[in-house]
Structure formats: structure tokens, C-alpha cells
Swiss-Prot record:
<keyword id="KW-0234">DNA repair</keyword>
<dbReference type="Pfam" id="PF02132">
    <property type="entry name" value="RecR_ZnF"/>
</dbReference>
<dbReference type="InterPro" id="IPR034137">
    <property type="entry name" value="TOPRIM_RecR"/>
</dbReference>
<dbReference type="GO" id="GO:0008270">
    <property type="term" value="F:zinc ion binding"/>
</dbReference>
<protein>
    <recommendedName>
        <fullName>Recombination protein RecR</fullName>
    </recommendedName>
</protein>
<dbReference type="GO" id="GO:0006310">
    <property type="term" value="P:DNA recombination"/>
</dbReference>
<keyword id="KW-0862">Zinc</keyword>
<dbReference type="Pfam" id="PF13662">
    <property type="entry name" value="Toprim_4"/>
</dbReference>
<keyword id="KW-0863">Zinc-finger</keyword>
<dbReference type="GO" id="GO:0006281">
    <property type="term" value="P:DNA repair"/>
</dbReference>
<comment type="function">
    <text>May play a role in DNA repair. It seems to be involved in an RecBC-independent recombinational process of DNA repair. It may act with RecF and RecO.</text>
</comment>
<dbReference type="InterPro" id="IPR000093">
    <property type="entry name" value="DNA_Rcmb_RecR"/>
</dbReference>
<comment type="similarity">
    <text>Belongs to the RecR family.</text>
</comment>
<dbReference type="InterPro" id="IPR006171">
    <property type="entry name" value="TOPRIM_dom"/>
</dbReference>
<keyword id="KW-0227">DNA damage</keyword>
<dbReference type="Pfam" id="PF21176">
    <property type="entry name" value="RecR_HhH"/>
</dbReference>
<dbReference type="InterPro" id="IPR023627">
    <property type="entry name" value="Rcmb_RecR"/>
</dbReference>
Length: 200
């Protein structure tokens, strides 16, 4: 039996989500059509709103609907002198849930990966350099993932900070090597923050 082109299109587009293969996408599509059409319409509206209205914070580059995000706008955080560098916006959420950090952030949107053509400019290190030059930070905390690429990125940023005589530390590796911040439990992340060490 030939299925509907619209259904095939829905299944194909659901596959763009991480971890969703052909079978999972098909189950999702059939569930929405058979049991939850109003939920499907709400999902479509939420996706449309998010895709059209959410951009990047002009200071830290996380996701926001405003020019600057709530964290960057917070006066107490502006005077903390602490900057935490993370790879992805989801990493901010993971760190915020621990309640261990009261400074500001900078999101790289990735990590250095020369083999994939991702150099310093592609992850916004020129913008980070400007922030370090224009704002007063007494410590930069590197919270990149404990991977080869994350380590290389952290070392590159550490050099940038040391050239400006800014204290630089890296969160401790209570996080499993090869893991990603957004999947780590709060206790492990708390220990990692409390056990961070200075580089250089």
C-alpha cells in the first residue's frame, strides 16, 4: 500500500531530530495523526514561533527572544567578574540547575575541529576576544566538554586569557571523558564546578 505523500514528508522531517530513526519517526507521525491531532497542531505552532522568534543574545550568544538574555541583563551577574565559556546553549541550562555559578556566559556554538573546517572564527573566538578586551573579568572558567576537541578548545582559550593576565580555570573532570554537559546529573556537575583548577 502506498502511503500519503504528506505522511511520508512528516516522517522524513521528524528524522531530523537527534536519535530519531525511521521507525521512531514513523511511530511519532502515526501517534500524532491517530491520537493527538491537537497536540500536533500545538507542536507545529510552537516550532513555528520558536524558529521565527528565537535568536542569539548579542553578548553571550545563547538563545533568546530579546537583544540580550536575562542572565546578561542581570546587574548582579554583570559585576561578578566571572565568565564561563561553554560549547552549547544547553550547557548553560545544565550549569544553572546546579546553582553553583553566579557569573555570565559565552557560548561557542561548538568546538575547534580543524579537520571539519571549524577554526577560531567559526566558534566566535574573535567575539570572545572582544569581550575579554572590553569588559572586566577576573576569572574565565572553561566548561568545554571533556573530549579531544573540547580540550583543544579550552587550551586555545586559556592562551588567550593568559595573554591578558586573566585567571583561567577549567571545571574538574568529574564528568566522564567523552560525555556532554547537558546529559550530566546535577551532583556530578556541582562537584566539577567546585573542583575546577587553574590553567597556567
Amino acid at each position: 500500500m502506498q502511503s500519503s505523500p504528506l505522511l511520508e514528508n512528516l516522517v522524513e522531517h521528524l528524522r531530523c531530530l537527534p536519535g530519531v530513526g525511521p521507525k521512531s519517526a514513523q511511530r511519532m507521525a502515526y501517534h500524532l495523526l491517530q491520537r493527538d491531532r491537537s497536540g500536533g497542531m500545538n507542536l507545529a505552532r510552537a516550532l513555528t514561533d520558536a524558529m521565527s522568534k528565537i535568536g542569539h543574545c548579542s553578548q553571550c550568544r545563547t538563545f533568546t527572544e530579546q537583544e540580550t538574555c536575562a542572565i546578561c541583563d542581570n546587574p548582579r551577574r554583570q559585576h561578578s567578574g566571572l565568565l564561563c565559556v561553554v560549547e552549547m546553549p544547553a550547557d548553560i541550562q545544565a550549569i544553572e540547575q546546579t546553582g553553583q555559578f553566579s557569573g555570565r556566559y559565552f557560548v561557542l556554538m561548538g568546538h575547534l575541529s580543524p579537520l571539519d573546517g571549524i577554526g577560531p572564527r567559526e566558534i566566535g573566538l574573535d567575539l570572545l576576544q572582544q569581550r575579554l578586551q572590553n569588559e572586566h573579568f577576573h576569572e574565565v572558567i572553561l566548561a568545554t566538554n571533556p573530549t579531544i576537541e573540547g580540550d583543544a578548545t579550552a587550551n586555545y582559550i586559556a592562551e588567550m586569557c593568559m595573554q591578558r593576565n586573566i585567571k583561567v580555570s577549567r571545571i574538574a573532570h568529574g564528568i566522564p571523558v567523552g560525555g556532554e554537559l547537558e546529559t550530566v546529573d546535577g551532583t556530578t556537575l556541582t562537584h566539577s564546578f567546585l573542583g575546577r583548577r587553574e590553567l597556567g
